Amino acid sequence: MSLKILIFYFLSSIFFLTNNIFASHVTVVDGDTIKLGDIKIRFSGIDAPEIKQTCIASEGKVACGKISKDTLIAKVTNNKISCTDEGKDVYGRVLGECFVNGESLSSYLVREGFAFAYRKYSNKYVQDEEYAKSNKLGMWSMEFEYPWDFRSNN
């Protein structure tokens, strides 16, 4: 009986390991996409401004897409990243949630106002977005266009 349990736990751990991606070298593509080696991972459930996207802050026009990317770069620099593999999107990118020291990067970006809950696909980050909005954090302190609207209009 104990051998069956041991085999079950062994096989379960192999299954869970194959659904995770680990790396210490990360390249930030934009505010919601990274590369771990050759694997491009799009954070599921969030949407960040496009690199060329701008917002209007009190000091004038700012590159909010670049700010979102730079925020992610600062968070992952010199840290080990782990990501879940949740399948692929229509562009062939791996969809997943990535973590630094156990903290979800998606949750962090949305809660700080540098990405939005992508309600079209998930409600997971809605509370984080409500927090950022009510505290006027990140893009919530500016005039902005949602990334999905920006893509449609440009």
Language-model region placement:
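Small beta-barrel nucleic-acid-binding modules, primarily SNase/OB-fold domains
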Residues: S2-N154
